């Protein structure tokens, strides 16, 4: 049910490369958010339980409608990790296997990179 594992692994490696190219430091821990969704809340809940057993923090599910008006439920499975292809590929494989077992969609992962160099002057809107 999830995207093809090879596509997910390629996307993961490309994401790591892009983050590093943008200045992300590989030795820091980042909050990695893996995205899962299903139209069947019970199946999504089963995936959440399995991911918690594997050590992931699972957010409450959000409900949304797709462009066709179909109702979906989604959550993020969160963990801290370095921007390391081996670590992240292991997570992708693990989560994709759980998603397939539970018949839910896994769409890969993302993270936020905070720019510590931003200060109050950078955020000034020009009004004084």
UniProtKB/Swiss-Prot annotation:
Q: What is its main location?
A: cytoplasm
Name of this chain's protein: Regulator of ribonuclease activity B
User: Which superkingdom is the protein from?
Assistant: Bacteria
What this protein is reported to do is described as: Globally modulates RNA abundance by binding to RNase E (Rne) and regulating its endonucleolytic activity. Can modulate Rne action in a substrate-dependent manner by altering the composition of the degradosome.
The listed locations are: Cytoplasm
SUPFAM superfamilies, alphabetized: Hypothetical protein VC0424
MF terms per GO, please?
A: endoribonuclease inhibitor activity; enzyme binding
One GO CC annotation, please?
A: cytoplasm
UniProt keywords, alphabetically? Cytoplasm
Q: Which family does it belong to?
A: Belongs to the RraB family.
Quote the InterPro entries the UniProt record gives.
RraB (IPR016716), RraB-like_sf (IPR036701), RraB_dom (IPR009671)
- Would the keyword Cytoplasm be found if you checked this record's keyword annotation? yes
Complex and partners? Interacts with the C-terminal region of Rne.
